[in-house]
Amino acid sequence: VKENKRKLDDENFKLLLFAENQKTGRTKYNGILDAYALLENYDKQKTLTLESQIDQGYAAEKLGGYKRAKIYYRRALKKAPDENVDLILQLVGELKRLYERSKDHKSLVQIYKRAYGALKKSSRPKKELRTYAYLIGYHQFFHLKQNKNARVWLMRSDGGGSSTQELQSAYWVAKLDQQAKKPELALKRLKELSGRKISKKSALYVQIHFELGTLFHLKENWDSALRHYRFAAKASAPEEFKKIQTVAEEKAKEIAKYLKSIKAAQG
């Protein structure tokens, strides 16, 4: 074929690709890319099909050509039909690994939105849909500083349940409300959140009740602040949250002392 002695039709190309796939290591992946480079000379459009782009992306990644692999996988993702959710999620997974490697949070959000869009049109479990909403919101909040957008996606990821993902999403929305100087909204959200089933051994249990204690403290709602500070202080939280628990315990003692002094003054 390379010496132009044989036309590279579909059958011959399949034979060539099969032969290259029988090889091992770098020889195999270089051979695959060379085969597609040769095909391009005969019919460029055939190198741009969905299957061809995936093949080339896989080979490029195996050879350490991460930038090149991203281009191939991105094209494949664009061509993948929404109905083929499994393929879309597979390609999103390939690109996720590459974008995480280069810390490209903007592109991660783009591919997660593609997954979300396909899942929304499908009859797959809502849990999968909420997972991608969570990932979008997470990257927008912590890496891209797009707080308004992050809030929308994090709210979509919270189905009102008690999974770690849902609890974390609702907590972050409350934090965003606080940052937006909307304490009443944050308080309302945290109160609703505290009513869900949350393990007293979890970090979130401490964080939620500490935040509630702080917000009630600012409102001078002493009884409520005392109650939530005590919840936070008495929880069996992970070691890294002991400092917050110590602060909660100190705040609870201060409020209890203050309430006692008021009661004494009133006779």
Sequence positions of predicted segments:
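Structural motif corresponding to the intra-repeat A-B loop/turn of tetratricopeptide repeats
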Residues: 26, 63, 102, 143-144, ...
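Solenoid-like repeat scaffolds
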Residues: 2-6, 40-48, 77-84, 114-125, ...
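Hydrophobic/aromatic packing residues within the alpha-helices of TPR/SEL1-like helical repeat arrays
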Residues: 32, 36-39, 73, 112, ...
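"A position-specific structural signal for the A-helix of alpha-solenoid helical repeats
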Residues: 13-17, 55, 90, 94, ...
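Single-residue signature of alpha-solenoid repeat helices
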Residues: 28, 32-35, 69, 108, ...
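Residues that mark the junctions of alpha-helical repeat units in TPR/alpha-solenoid scaffolds
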Residues: 8-12, 32, 49, 84-91, ...
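Residue-level recognition of tetratricopeptide repeat
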Residues: 20, 58, 93, 97-100, ...
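TPR/TPR-like (Sel1-like) alpha-helical repeat modules
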Residues: 222-241, 246, 250-253
